[in-house]
Amino acid sequence: NLSLGFTLARNSTDNPIFPRKGSDFSASVHLTPPYSLFSDKDYATYGKNDYDEAASVYNWIEYHKWKFKAKTYTALTGGAKCPVIMTRAEFGLLGHYNKYKKSPFETFYMGGDGMTGYSTSYASETIALRGYENGSLTPYGSEGYAYIRLGAELRYPLMLENSTSIYALGFIEGGN
């Protein structure tokens, strides 16, 4: 898999552990060469009767993958120990150059804690969505070619020290 990636990111938060104000934005794209444009194969009928021929469709994976992530932090009062609202929006899209040569790799695996790193398919990106089982929002047969995740958190610091930061939070989250 040969790909070229570009990322544009900006972070204006005031603290990396417990941000009280600012924002964090990133937009990225990963592109592979459109190998099927340089090939004389007709992928609409390619590999219909031959397993080895069908498997060779994925010798050179081609896709374009777009992602956008945004977080904003807003303090509700002044001072060091103040409640903070964090809002989040993110989406991703895995596209293809040839509709008969969709990539089964680099898909999105959505739902769950996002910490296990386990998915049922190879080379999937795990997208956490609290309150759901791991992977439960990726429809079977759709392979997770797109996702959207929206959320908000209300955070309250319990202890903010140089060596330890502890805070309580309530959240609402949704996605597909």
Residues covered by each model-derived region:
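C-terminal outer-membrane beta-barrel translocator/porin domains of Gram-negative envelope proteins
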Residues: N1-L158, G170-F171
